[in-house]
Regions:
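Chalcogenol-based redox active-site neighborhoods
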Residues: 1-150
């Protein structure tokens, strides 16, 4: 998805079964990140980078929300194990992943399969995508997201 376009509306359930939608973030800036699987090395590094810099996001008026195919129970364990201060949405049917072009063909060790494409969108207060990051540096993702913001 390109910057300057309207972010697709979505409705999903967080780790506690509470409904979460893009509309919940109207008037707020949102970091919406898509990742393959809870508790895997890259996904853990990415989540912990966001956690360790969460105060910076809040200071700049951002909310953070993660989305993966994992179950709500898996998300609860992931949040608890790593003390994540933000919510994670369960998308087992890949509806949100597909709407945000974060589901597609991947190549790993010469084999092709469909899966989650690690992607992050920064969405402004009006629901417009202001940044789209497709080549995520899991250990330094905050630098990619916030760039020159202080």
């Amino acid at each position: 998805m390109e910057t300057g376009t309207k972010a697709p509306e979505f409705i999903g359930a967080d780790e506690n079964g509470n409904e979460v939608s893009l509309n919940d973030f109207k008037g707020k800036k949102l970091v919406l990140y898509f990742y393959p699987k809870d508790s895997t090395p890259g996904c853990t590094a990415e989540a912990c980078d966001l956690r360790d810099n969460y105060h910076r996001y809040l200071a700049l008026g951002y909310q953070v929300l993660g989305v993966s195919k994992d179950s709500q129970a898996s998300h609860r364990k992931f949040i608890e194990k790593y003390s994540l201060p933000f919510h994670l949405v369960s998308d087992p049917e890949c509806a949100i992943l597909k709407a945000y072009e974060a589901w597609g063909l991947k190549k790993l060790y010469g084999k092709e399969s469909y899966g989650t494409l690690r992607t992050t969108y920064v969405i402004d207060e009006d629901g417009i995508i202001i940044d789209a990051i497709g080549k995520v540096n899991t250990k330094g993702h905050t630098t990619q997201i916030l760039g020159s913001e202080k």
